[in-house]
Amino acid sequence: MKKVLLLIASMMLLVAGPAFAQNIRVSGTVTDSNGDPVPGAAVMLQGSTSVGTATLANGSYSLSVPSNGTLVVSSVGYKEASAPVNGRAVINFVLEDDAEVLEQAIAVGYGSAKKISSIVGSVSTVNSETIKNAPSSSALDQLQGQVAGLSVLSYSGIAGDNAVSMTLHGVGSLEASTTPLYVIDGIPSSSTAVMNMNPNDIESVSVLKDASATSIYGSRAANGVVYISTKSGSYNTKASVTYRGQWGVSTLADTSLYESMMSSSELMDFWVRAGIHSQDWIDSTYLSKGYNYDTPWYKYMMDLWNPQYQNDLTIEGGGSKVAYMIAASQYHQKGYTPGNFFDRYTLRSNVQAHPLEWLKTGVNLNLSLSNTQQNPNWGSAANGMSNYTSGGLSFLLIPMYPALDENGKVYEKKFPGQNRITPTYYMENHIDQYDRYGANGNVFVEIEPIRNLKFVSRVGVDGYIRLNNWETMPSYVAANGGTATVGHSSALEYAANITNTVEYTFQITDDHKFSVLAGHEGVENYYTYFSASSSGQTDDRLARVNDGTADSRSVSESYSESRFLSFFGHLDYTLMDRYIFDATIRNDASSRFGKDVRNALFWSLGGMWKLKKENFLKNVRAVNDLNLKVSYGTQGNAGIGNYSHLGLVGSTGKYADANGIHVAQPANSHLTWERQGLFTTALTGRLFNFLDFDLEYYLRKTSSMLLDVPQPYTSGIDEATNNVGSLQNSGIDVTLGFDILRGRDYWMRFNTTFNYNAQKVTELFDGKHTWPMYSYMIAYVVGSPVMFYNPVFAGIDPEDGMPMWYVPGDDPDVLTMDKTTKVFDDEGLTQNTGKKRYAPINGGFSLSGGWKGLSVQADFSYVLGKYLVSNDGYFYGNPANFSTMNTNKAVSDFWTPDHRDAKWPDWSKGAVMQFDTHLLEDASFLRLKNLQIAYSLPKVLLGWQNAVKDLKITFTGRNLLTFTKYTGIDPEINSNLTYGVGGNSKQFLGGIEVKF
């Protein structure tokens, strides 16, 4: 018995021994592989949930633990580390990066989000740090130069005109839609919905580029997919409130064109020297009537420094069952044209709930209200030249005229003999205002009845109501002639979407992993428009539609609708974590085509080889990651009118005193999908633990293009839409990023993107080799990209100072410069200029760096091989033809008998410069798109109080520098020509971000 008691006592002492071990204080630091401190890391005693601490800002910690215990250190983004105490007083830890944790999970289709390393498709992601605090009102503008192969060009800098032109891997169709599909949180949406979002609500933007990534979206993904994920709250997170504010000014990005116009003295001197007007004529027409001012009109027609500000408030957090994010924003920008402004208000609510282990649901809704007032004639040629001073061509007004009257008020009269009105006065009395009410969002339910089997049902809507009011004030027309006009219009547009998917993820063994997805999607698009207008109002106080004359009242109404129905499936298979394969199939049906041809099947196959996991590379330290990707698939394009396949009739003139009708559009029951095949291969990876790269080649072939084909004159129809012709785009994408410097409290990184795209028309219609479009100054030529077709300017004849043009050869598709003529014939002299309509090269680069709390980032974007016809130059470069307009200083270099090598002709002979290649300018450019300087206050300075957790001060600039040879208003405009458009704007903004 005694032996038994001794044995029990001994065992109790052995068990209790550790409990009586002596506690000692252990301290040390936790750093990463670069030697930088890791603040907030958890340092815990192994086996205990109550003994532990968190590292300070400098990575240090201090903790009292048993001398024979073990410390465990963990932090998000790093692998867990542990070390026995063994009586030591100092223990330092170096944490290794955990690539699996650091890697971002993104959504690329209808299923669960995936980590980038497991995605076979080509996907480029831009995070919120690049997008937030954007000076532009559009988040899409921030993508310029950020994604290889994605071309983003801004239309203008007019407040409220935040549209951009976006194409991926070239222009994939000659006449059907060429814009990507926009998806917001899983719901296909319009570009308008994206542009009416607050950029600070966006978590990330993923651009899906190859067939493996896009084929799941079928017919709408022929031009790529831009997937936008908005911010959301996190479960088990304390509530936080973040305020962001930005205040600054905007102005024209470039005023060099306006500054190159002549002053009054320069213009009058030029007229006399060039033999356009005599001094006597100038005296009698201007000076004797008191018109001896020197007005720089662009300074009066534009407000060059305008306020811009934005205020955001975000509340986010979550408990064990609910996560939430609520954000409100207000944005204001005053434009540089008189009366122009843009106001936007948004409210976003993103709430997710996990009430049961097998049930998840959520609501994500964005409401927006915007109000825009614009100059109705800015950039428009609707009124011809009679009102050219009302908009973007106002700088052509003669500088001898006054902008203000003798009382310092805006000059309200017509200038004698000119039929011209002061631009400011004209715009102030021609009001054009838009109110837009938008809603975009979705509701989803996710059920997981058994582990890894998920059923998801999602309903979404993207819609808006737009109200437009326009009027020409009666008091204005009473003083200047004409007729008052008042009009109102309303438009309603929405797209309703419902998606149901089932997804099952499983593995047979550790070497064989599968994910299977099947789904259904239905989309309904609807648009309706109504307008009413009248004229003849006589009093500003009674300027309503019903105050106009009875015979002037006009009412119009229209509507349009379309539907899509789709079924799809997707399979992912991973073999030994080294070989990943995916396959997609989708059937789409569209109401835009006849019932016999409206269904189409699209598919893709893709594979990825994770080379780094092979034995021959596993131990090669210079290679951190290396992946080879290959994919091929098909997509469709239905980007045409909703009723292009139907036979339509329209009203025409009277016959036998009865209203007549005519065939406006012939029926085409065989009209069907434009098709595309896309092959992509890529090599991605990381070398030497500092160089990230992504090299990609693509071949994109479009067939059965949706083209408006000319019809015989005897048919009475100009053109009809048919499936004809084919087009090819091929090219390379290069994305590089590497660390220049990285130390304990400083860093510097360089990133760059590059795309080269080769376009080629491979087939037209009716056996044609060339299809010139003279009014657009371009032509489609088999075997070539879309080319500029113009008369080719041959310079000035040194003998007589008259302009010359090259005579085309037998084949106008080949540039010929052998013979010249001085007799201009537009179509007869038109030939291939050798200049491409679409730029083959675009990209960008950024340099970012930081030291402690200070950070700087500069983003540049560029386009090479871009050309624009400067239509404006036809007016300011033709002083003999437009002798009552101002002109550019450059035309002073004109021909005289003593100056025979001049760039411009002998104006005294009435020489006229024509629409030819002298107006076709190189519009390639390099632009400092964004510059951001930020400073985050050290937490030690905030430690004296508990309210403010983080405080950041920022300075942001946009479009600060532009390098280009283009002499027009702005080289970034995506068009074949420019005419009176508003150039891009430049912003300077200061900001503050406070987190409570």
Please report, for each region that a protein language model flagged, where it lies by residue:
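Transmembrane beta-strand segments that form the barrel wall of outer-membrane beta-barrel proteins
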Residues: 245, 328-334, 581-590, 739-740
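Residue-level signature of outer-membrane beta-barrel architecture
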Residues: 230, 317-319, 330, 353-354, ...
